[in-house]
From Swiss-Prot:
It is found in: Virion; Host nucleus. This is Hexon-interlacing protein. InterPro entries: Hexon_assoc_IX. Belongs to the adenoviridae hexon-interlacing protein family. Residues 100-127 form a coiled coil. Homotrimer. Interacts with hexon protein; this interaction tethers the hexons together. Self-interacts with adjacent proteins. Interacts with kinesin light chain KLC1; this interaction leads to capsid disruption at the nuclear pore complex during virus entry into host cell. This protein is only encoded by mastadenoviruses, and may therefore play a role in mammals tropism. One of its GO terms (molecular function) is hexon binding. One of its GO terms (biological process) is symbiont entry into host cell. Induction: Expressed in the intermediate phase of the viral replicative cycle. The gene is IX. GO terms for cellular component: host cell nucleus; viral capsid, decoration. It comes from Human adenovirus C serotype 5 (HAdV-5). Keywords: Capsid decoration protein, Capsid protein, Coiled coil, Host nucleus, Host-virus interaction, Virion, Virus entry into host cell.
Amino acid sequence: MSTNSFDGSIVSSYLTTRMPPWAGVRQNVMGSSIDGRPVLPANSTTLTYETVSGTPLETAASAAASAAAATARGIVTDFAFLSPLASSAASRSSARDDKLTALLAQLDSLTRELNVVSQQLLDLRQQVSALKASSPPNAV
């Protein structure tokens, strides 16, 4: 079977990568689909996607999917490409942490102020209750 022929089956590494370790599947060994056809292992450098019917649109889509998978794999393994992105993400994370710390400090300050105001309100209620209790009923 040629890897470029699209004869109706969907071929992926799903069947070999999802098997439990006790099933004896090795990552560098060719697997097989339900109907016994070969499936490339999960650590293969090429993933091919075959289509159900061989229309030109599906063929182009499967070629694009294969190219996207290869590109994604290349990007993931290219640490030189990822390191500026990682440092940028780390600086954004640090800035977010600083903002969060400032917000938490403000929240703590507001909580203390709220406690003071709540205590003052409680004192005022007690004073009003004491005044009502000590004043004659018709004085209001």
